[in-house]
Amino acid sequence: MRVRNQLLGAVCAVPLLALGAASVQAASIAKHCGPKDKYVVAFSQANYAEPYRQHVNNDLTELAKAIPQFDLQIADGAGNDNTQTSQVDNFVTQGVDLLLISPFEAAPLTPAVTRAMKAGIPVIELDRQTNGDPGKDYTAFVGGDNYKIAFEAGAYTAKTLLPDGGDVAVLEGLPSSTPAVQRLNGFKDGVKQNAKIKVVAEQAADWLPDKAQTAFSAILQAHPDVKVVYASNDMMAAGSYLAAKGAGKEGQIGIIGTDGLPGPAGGVRAVASGQWAATFTYPTGAAEALDLAKKILIDCADSVPASVIVPTLAITKINAADLDKKLKF
């Protein structure tokens, strides 16, 4: 049964691929393939609550329409490991031809991915990863370099926002997810380029705006001299802005997000309007993931890149207004 998702999203320009050096061996490629057959491509999404994930779903849905051999089915993991595990196991039982997955958390979803691989179903992990290595424990990974994206945000803070130094706070995503750990470490390493910067607070807000608002409000009370806050996604950046505004510090604190989503509630608009200092795009990887799926199922490829890394773009006051006008929502 085809699942259709009526979701708001944006169609952004697809960047060039940066392909990992390792390749998957033939044993990991689909058992059945060819251009004349129909294939069920199942996607287990971590949740539908985050705007970024809606954006991913929308991109996949729109792009899959151009591939007549594909029947794309999307399931909402609802931010619950047990729910997502059950959905993946159901896909395996149904005998889908290829599994895409953005795991809610790494460790809890690893056994389900292992079961899919043992059943002979190619698995492409999108945005987030389970434990193990792409090309070995699962077929391939498609996503941004979370560490590098956050490192660039840290470097931007060190060189542009706080060249004379100052106090900085960090709002981390869900600590048990790979992007949260990678972005936290990347930003902290990036700001080390300026020895005068001090990270005075780190707080997990689980990617959620309300938790970010509460956390940053408490941080501002404990550290009133904070000049910049790095939020690991745009939703937490939005919560940080509300906290700063509530503390009477609107316009006094540089807010940095990650995702670079378009639209009225997205990070691009927030930077263009002057509410935030910057955000860094995290492309959906939808086109790249479907391209790998085509190679595996339609082209009968005997090897595919184990990692496809999509590059980021810094959105600042220099380019935000122009991008906001160009991007569709």
Spans of features found by a protein language model:
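Hydrophobic alpha-helical
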Residues: P103-K118, F187, A201, A205-G266
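Flexible loop/hinge segments that line or gate small-molecule binding clefts
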Residues: A106-A107, P111-K148, K159, D167, ...
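Short, solvent-exposed amphipathic alpha-helices that sit
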Residues: Y52-A66, F70, I149-Y156, T178-I197, ...
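Extracytoplasmic "Venus flytrap"
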Residues: I29-L63, I67, L72-N90, V96, ...
